[in-house]
């Protein structure tokens, strides 16, 4: 419908009808709006189309407007909260809103605005204009109430314009029409802000316009606040109180209307407060808050004057809150003092309207504020005002007094009208009567803390006596707080603050030289400390008095100090530590001397005895040198006192102290105690038997402590002999005495065995205990034993074990453990069941170690029956962890895990609390952790397992280091008993690191174990650990060192027991295996199997000892028999299970089978594998080992099948790729084959097809078998085993792919093959990094139980997500090339990995050229490796010696040899490229493929194949994978030297693909020359049309552990390319996933954020001369000719974007790998030292070196050298590299800058020795760019 028709159709509507419609919500619609506009427009335009047209007047419009506004308010009130929010959003985007969905509110507002516009049009006079203004303000009010500010902005600006017009023409009747026209306004918040100010008018006009103006100004502020601008400008804020601003308009508009004025003031105040919260400028916020406070104060004063109901408290609270915000905002750097004074002054007169309490609050805040501004005089003025006002308020009075103290410290010239000490003293009494509230106490403590801090640093105020008096008074005041009403958190908070207050007081006290004069002043502080249970202050004060005593030369003052010190210690119960003994000793020294009278001496001794009684009564007395000193002096002094006085003195002491004296008296030579004194002490003890037992037990303790000290042992033996003589006459019928007799006899024999290693001594010990049990087993349970006596027995028990265990006498250990098990079984009281659990568990574990699982289970079961009686958790835990480990080792893994979940971590205190000595407790705890670590290790939790062992080693290290500083009596007796457990802990740590592939760490811990074991006098103990070290060194590539250890032990092992012969043979077998002496390895492993049988027979005799009449005879027979009796089937019916021993034999048989397989004895290997399976435990490790062996047997069988066919036998020497044939082509042929159609391919012989199928099935079985165990192997197996599994998977996958015929479906794909090739490369690295993080994060393990450990699992990579997570996360322009050599060193595996593509994998046999040309020299891997090592070794040697040559002739010779080595290295790299890579070197070429040209080349390639293979039209030409065809492109344009040979390599590769996949043809019929020419023509066509583009590609080399030492970056095919390297794809992904990596591709380095270290060793003068000026000029933080500390080094790495190091090595001498592992961020690092980038090979283990440490620390880019370099050449390289990178010169903008990888590549050529020095620098990680 046209506009005209709309208009004509609506003329019948009258203004009254419109007004009616606008009054009702249901009439509001788009139609009404259109009608309204049409109707009003008719009137305005005066188009009288119809006589009935409506007649609109200004009054009609005004009424319609009011109706619409009223309706608008109603409509809005009825909307829900959700609809209101939706409507607000509609107003933000009205143009994009469908009109059909607009609410009525929207149309009403449109009507209002339109009517308002028309009112403006028809306005003729000021009255009309006034109504327009009122209407504009009204609609703005509604909009702002609705929080819709967008349309309100323009309305307010129009209203402001109208206001200006109205005020201008206020005295005129008419207004010029041109003035009222509405020009286009610049609608913005900034323009709106200027509308706040309206010109002031005369007072006579306020009646009509004032209210409107004020409302308008408030609406402007509301709109500005809703629009969320940054705040008001400073100019606007300063003018708010101007004549045109809202302040003055409010004051003049409502001179007598208080309520109206206050309501506007309140709104304005709230708006200003809101603006203060969104301001970005502190000054502006400050001014706004001041204005807001002024408004509130005006409201307060006017309301009080009006005297109406008003909530004064609420208003004052608001004012105080705002004032607090003002104080918080005020900072001298933001708000100047002059501005502060000026703005604060305007509030002074208003503050008088506040209540007294509020004024006190503000005065206190003002004093603090001006104090903050260092205006101490003005601050003091406010303090004085506040003090005067707070006369009756003691709380505020105290605050002002304390603040005056703080001001006095700053400025002692300030005079206060009061005496601070007197005023505080008067307050003290008031607070005693009226308790100090908690909140006031906190404020008081905070205030005094700040004051005391100032006092400590003040140079103006130094009156310490004054400060101490204040502390005393405040202490009494603080003591008035009622503690009982405080909650726990409040009390703790108060105690903490009081502790700080007391420490400040103590700091003051320390300044006094004569402290005893101020005892009264100290009482308040000591009382406060006692009231709040703080022991630190009295302890420090007591110790300080002791120190004053020691330092004082005045004897009397010293006595006063020590007396007060002891008094404080006693009154505060500080009598249980060593310092208390020192005070007793000092007091005794000062007061006792020979010149004293007898009574005076007795008094001093009596006082000392009383003081010692307090010590003995509050602590468990241990060894103490101070106590020894006191006792010596006491015993010396007793010699001058007669017997009667001695008896009186001894009668007054406690029984505990008496026993202590008696023990010391028995050590007469040590304490100078006479025999007479010992006799007196013994008489004072109760009865003879107790004296004897006590003395005997003391002798046992001395024997235990004196072990390993020859002189002391002699003394102990004499004491023991004397006790034995006494015992022999009393022990015939007394079980308790007989037990002590056996104990002393055993000690004597054990000490003698220690000296001579005489086995008869051990037999005597066992026999004596056997006799004792047989005689007293029935009566001993009725005897009562003290903890001291039981500990004496246990000390001997553990001492015996710790002595015999290192000797290797396993049968002695077993016999002794069983005897003591029977002994404690006889002593079975409830309190002794825990010892049975310990002994039984140790016995079970010993049987388990030997392999006799049945015997172990028997004693575990017996122990379990006692667990119900034993309620002590550490002993239950001890059994739980040992039994859990047993279950795991015997194949019951699930049960073992359930058992371990019952375990909770024990501590030394747990064992100590059960009455065990510290030595025994430590041993049990450390032993328990070894068991737990071993169990977790068996389950695959290597990181946590290592954590527990490192805890052990940390404890042991602390004890060893402590004991080395102590005398004999302090610690040595502990450390020798920890030798065995320490050695075993080190072995456990070594085994875990060995499992993780970290040979260097493993070697360290093995050597630690050897070092510890050598301190023991038993050769077998040391030999055990040396053989383990031998095994490690052999497998780590250090064969010579391993052989030497083995040779040194050869003679010793001939005369040892069977068990150690077994260990020696095992080590010998590993040495032979490493040397590839298969016969020798098999011989020694077979000998191990025989020795296991002998062990089984020997221990069978021991197990049946109960049939012997004497246990000793059975043991003698066992230890002395020369020809063992072998166990047969007939005599084992009653014998025990030995599955663990048999499992060991099974492992040996598997090893023998492996070597028989290498010898080619397939059938023998199969038979041995079958035998091993029969006796193997079904544990995880056995399953993995069995699967690996089974897979290798299948592979060997497959290899023999290959050699049976003339076609397939060439497969091992042929290049194999995955993929080969296009997947699409394979799929199409598979469909054709399924439909039964003729594929056109000729079948080969049936035999060949049969062999191919058989091979594929075998290879598939290998792959599937290994894939099944992969996940568990990755999580739990060693790194070596995991690599072995993955190599089998990769080999079988690629070989199976090569044999897949065309059209055959297969589940083999390159992504899964690449996954198994790449994943194990990072396993060792990640395990080591996790272990380091675990050790750094868990210095102490805090697991409450093993539940959370055992429920957690290692994150295992998933082959299904490999493509997404690893490959497709790479940058699209990257070319990742992975290089791996197999274990035999015969095949090179190269993978090309790109985003969006499946990996391309090649197996390149290094001898493939020899199969085509027998005369061609083969470059095998070992030969190339040896040549590289020779060149580098010679270069390293020459680099070190070159600086010593001074003669010209020597230098020339040196340079000649260096150049020759450079040429040798160049030739080696060229040979590697030609011989190893050949035609496949294009895999490194980052050539960007032109898709259209490539499609054309692919088509030509198909035609060439069809032509040269003479295929008929029915036979489809096999389509190769695009990745294969790209190899021809990446070889480059034909024509360069050697191209034909490279192309020939690819041609033969293609022929092999077709042949092995079932396309049969005769090699002789194919003209390879013609094929080569055709391909060159096609390639020339490609390159002639190819347009090169800028290539920003980057190549990342993923180098396996055996190939990393080669400088691949310097191969000719990689020359001048951007190349970096990483050890694994996983490490690359970790780097790319870091947050600072840009676009997942590179890192950016800020040029100014760097650090450096230059010449820290002071011997690189040339380097310093070259770089010093440039580094200093760069302005970076660094060190020149100065050695950094570890902290400096770490800070430079973590606190900057890049780090330069010009020194020796890689900085290893300044930091450690563990420190690097703690870094959360590591800079881009450039290490230009020799061999800083070298990774050192470790045989079958993982390499180690500086680069791995930096990569582990998160370093994204590391530049380092692979070998030693000469400084001048590498300095030249470094300078060129850093200039090219852009660090030393201004470069172009970032888009044209050079990455560090390109800079390194381009800088190699500047070296004189291009390869020897230029090839050494490499980059680990990803590219890095300098940000300009």
From Swiss-Prot:
One family name in Pfam for this protein: Peptidase_C50
Keyword Protease carried by entry: yes
InterPro entries: Peptidase_C50, SEPARIN_core_dom
Top-level EC class: hydrolase
Reaction(s) catalysed (UniProt annotation): All bonds known to be hydrolyzed by this endopeptidase have arginine in P1 and an acidic residue in P4. P6 is often occupied by an acidic residue or by a hydroxy-amino-acid residue, the phosphorylation of which enhances cleavage
Activity regulation description: It is inactivated via its interaction with cut2, which probably covers its active site. Cut2 degradation at anaphase, liberates it and triggers rad21 cleavage.
Alphabetical keyword list: Cell cycle, Cell division, Chromosome partition, Cytoplasm, Hydrolase, Nucleus, Protease, Thiol protease
GO cellular component, one term: mitotic spindle pole body
Active site: 1730
Enzyme Commission (EC) number: 3.4.22.49
Domain Peptidase C50: 1647-1741
Compartment(s) of residence: Cytoplasm; Nucleus
Residue ranges that the Swiss-Prot or TrEMBL entry lists as coiled coil: none
One of the protein's GO biological processes: cell division
GO MF assignments: cysteine-type endopeptidase activity; endopeptidase activity
Function: Caspase-like protease, which plays a central role in the chromosome segregation by cleaving the rad21 subunit of the cohesin complex at the onset of anaphase. During most of the cell cycle, it is inactivated by securin/cut2 protein. It is also required for pointed nuclear formation.
Subunit structure comment from the entry: Interacts with cut2. Interacts with rad21.
Protein name per the record: Separin
Gene, per the UniProt record: cut1
